[in-house]
Amino acid sequence: MKITVLGCGALGQLWLSALCKHGHDVQGWLRVPQPYCSVNLIDTDGSFFNESLTANDPDFLAKSELLLVTLKAWQVSDAVRTLASTLPVTSPILLIHNGMGTIEELQNIQQPMLMGTITHAARRDGNIIIHVANGTTHIGPAREQDGDYSYLADILQGVLPDVAWHNNIRAEMWRKLAVNCVINPLTALWNCPNGELRHHTDEINAICEEVAAVIEREGYHTSADDLRYYVEQVIDSTAENISSMLQDVRAMRHTEIDYITGYLLKRARVHGLAVPENSRLFEMVKRKESEYERSGTGMPRPW
């Protein structure tokens, strides 16, 4: 399959290496155009992938059968709009990033839009990407007009398992958002690995209560207890991990808070719900972000 991967960070390189190893015809796409992108990845089994792959080839993009987007949430809309005019209108665009809200910014895109969540963990160590832990990718149609592309889940399952197709992906997206609303801001503010959050049960409870209320109003059945149990499972299974938001804060980069807690706040306002704990955390992360961005050190990384 001919696939363009938009974004060559940790997640992008994970997909590029996996797709390449399984015989797919792939290219990367970088914000600053370059003819090649370097993919250096150590997999969970210790194997090493080191290749220079084609990048930013518009002819390749014009024949691509899938655009896989692995950018940070705040980078997605502008980049996808730029590439959509060259991508065939029948080729689906799959967005995999933390948070929600990018689809609302891309309603007029002609191509089929899919969205997903991923629990694989990968991190950068110098110029090398380390695939820390295997996980699951959940994908599904982003809008009502986007059809059944479950065959893609079958193809991607053979590349980087596990991959699951959902006809209603939004329920899964909300579940992942609940986890992100807990883990990302708390670890970023406490400067700690995920496992340390076991000591902050009161804050976790407060966040889960508020998120559950919003999810119920969105039309998906859940409870604070269900969310809390799921969040605690994720904290335990990723105890040693450094969250993406904490990585961003440590590197003085723009975070995805606007698409995680920020999205929750927007939906809460629509439903007339007060979410004071999430509001407090949102303001604290934005304050931290503005401190280093104001000093000029928070330079956005290339895709």
Swiss-Prot record:
Keywords: Cytoplasm, NADP, Oxidoreductase, Pantothenate biosynthesis
Subcellular location: Cytoplasm
GO biological process: pantothenate biosynthetic process
Predominant subcellular localization, coarse grouping: cytoplasm
Binding site for substrate: 98, 180, 184, 194, 244
CC per GO annotation: cytoplasm
Superkingdom of origin organism: Bacteria
Pathway: Cofactor biosynthesis; (R)-pantothenate biosynthesis; (R)-pantoate from 3-methyl-2-oxobutanoate: step 2/2
Gene3D superfamilies noted in UniProt: N-(1-d-carboxylethyl)-l-norvaline Dehydrogenase, domain 2, NAD(P)-binding Rossmann-like Domain
pH dependence text: Optimum pH is 6.25.
SUPFAM superfamilies the UniProt entry points to: 6-phosphogluconate dehydrogenase C-terminal domain-like, NAD(P)-binding Rossmann-fold domains
Binding residues annotated for NADP(+), in chain numbering: 7-12, 98, 122, 256
Active site (record annotation): 176 (proton donor)
Keyword Acetylation: no
Reported temperature dependence: Optimum temperature is 42 degrees Celsius.
Gene Ontology MF terms: 2-dehydropantoate 2-reductase activity; NADP binding
Enzyme Commission (EC) number: 1.1.1.169
NADP in keyword set: yes
Protein purpose: Catalyzes the NADPH-dependent reduction of ketopantoate into pantoic acid. Has a strong preference for NADPH over NADH as the electron acceptor. Pantoate, ketoisovalerate, oxaloacetate, pyruvate, 3-hydroxypyruvate, alpha-ketoglutarate, alpha-ketobutyrate, and acetaldehyde cannot serve as substrates for reduction.
Family: Belongs to the ketopantoate reductase family.
Protein name according to UniProt: 2-dehydropantoate 2-reductase
Organism per entry: Salmonella typhimurium (strain LT2 / SGSC1412 / ATCC 700720)
Lineage: Bacteria, Pseudomonadati, Pseudomonadota, Gammaproteobacteria, Enterobacterales
